[in-house]
A protein has these predicted regions:
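Small/aliphatic-rich secondary-structure junction motif
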Residues: 2-51, 73-77
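Solvent-exposed polar/charged
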Residues: 22-25, 101-102, 132
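General small-molecule cofactor/ligand-binding pocket signal
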Residues: 32-34, 82-86, 139
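A short acidic, glycine-rich active-site loop
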Residues: 51-65
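Structural beta-alpha unit
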Residues: 72-108
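Glycine-rich, Arg-bearing micro-motifs that act as flexible, cationic patches
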Residues: 107-129
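Short, flexible loop segments at boundaries between secondary-structure elements
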Residues: 136-145
Length: 145
């Protein structure tokens, strides 16, 4: 079984990671961890041309920290893991779905919300779009309170 866990470093993504690890311990398979650094073009930010490279580098550095931490957790739990960072994707949900299609994953395990602003009563926009467009089943994990 191939399981994909997209992670942004949020507590919800971490809960999804631990859920996927438990699933893989019960059924042998491979874990794919993915973090996606959004492109600045897709953001509603006013940035001077000179600052855009600095901001993008900052986002990429943060993405590297996120994926490295998640990979360390998975390695520590003894599961087979492939870690990938996608840089400057115009759409985070599209990057997740594209990765799932390319790697032919069997299941995506994703947190209900990420680091973005979100309402208590609606699923995060990334998770919602992944559920609608994924080529496989999607297990949406709520954070344990």
């Amino acid at each position: 079984m191939k399981i994909l866990v997209p992670t942004d470093g949020s507590k919800y993504a971490e809960e999804a990671l631990y859920t996927a690890i438990e699933l893989l311990k019960a059924k042998e398979g491979e874990l794919f961890l993915l973090t996606v650094v959004p492109s600045l073009a897709g953001m509603d930010l006013e940035i001077s041309a000179g600052r855009s490279a600095d901001i993008l580098a900052e986002f990429e550095a943060q993405g590297a920290k996120v994926i490295n931490r998640a990979c360390d957790i998975a390695h520590g739990e003894g599961v087979k893991v492939t870690c990938k960072g996608e840089n400057t994707a115009p759409s985070i949900p599209d990057a997740i779905v594209d990765f799932a299609e390319k790697e032919k994953v069997d299941l995506i395990v994703i947190g209900t919300k990420g680091l973005g602003p979100s309402s208590r009563f609606r699923m995060g926009s990334v998770a919602s779009k992944v559920v609608r467009h994924a080529p496989c089943s999607v297990y949406v994990v709520k954070k344990k309170e």
